[in-house]
Amino acid sequence: MKGNQLELPPPGNGFFLSSSGGHFSELIYIAKRFKASSNSLILTFNGSDTKVGALEFNIHYIKYVKPRKFLPLLRMMPSIHRLMKNHEFNYIASTGAAIAIIGYLLSKIKRVPFYYVEIIARQTTLSLTAKILKLLGVGKIFVQSSLLQSSHNTYLEHPFNKYRVIKSKAFHVNGARRILVAFGTIQGFNFNRGLDLAKSIMNENDSIEWQVGFMNAGNLPGIKHEQIDRTDFLEAITRADVVICHGGIGVITDCLSSGKIPLVIPRRKSFGEHVDDHQVEIVNFLSEKGLAINLEIKHDRSVINYVLTNKVIH
């Protein structure tokens, strides 16, 4: 540590753990930011959003565990420990969620440093995982919000700070559009409110592709998928004129990386759509930068004009 600040680990072999979705996409970024070697190992949940193509790290999949269900993860700890015996690691790191606690416990057993990085969606409040880790004795963590920076929380700059919006060629806003709707793969939560808000800006001539996850979405116009293979999903984003999504950091990052400004509907705890309101935090943060539009606030056809006449560069 340098003063009160937590320093990045030296380049070497890391053991990285995360759940799926945005936690996983952030984990890949963090592994690269830590300059982890190609012998490093990533452990995550088995799902369409974690089945990436060529990756410079080894990857191991475990069964999906719903948010805040710690006991199933604890039962997996012996098998994860056995997996680690086949590798040499200089440190263990995690971006959450609850699986980070398993990573911390394993770091104590293996006597190696542990690093926790709060995902960028946490802009104003620490996650339950971060709070539990601090209670367990993790003195310092990395955060990606200047609002959370303190003597115990070291700020780690995120690539979002390098994104900016520029004008693009104009489209006729009332024309038919190719629309992709992506609501993630989280299990145990419905998002009918998101379906209704998405449909509110569509017209009958639009070509629509839906990725609805595991909720009961009923009949929808266009093509409906439960999950989309990772490669196909990125191609679908590229094809689309407009992407409507929930406030998952993974899909938002994919949109911005492809130059598109997403129309976002954050999941809210009060509607039973997620465990807390971290999606609201990231959507507010990105909306202030012009990098997203919150469809809760403005949900008519005119929002399409903004995303079609502006693009993201970095």
Where are these regions (language model features)?
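Nucleotide-activated sugar donor-binding and catalytic core shared by glycosyltransferases
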Residues: 1-314
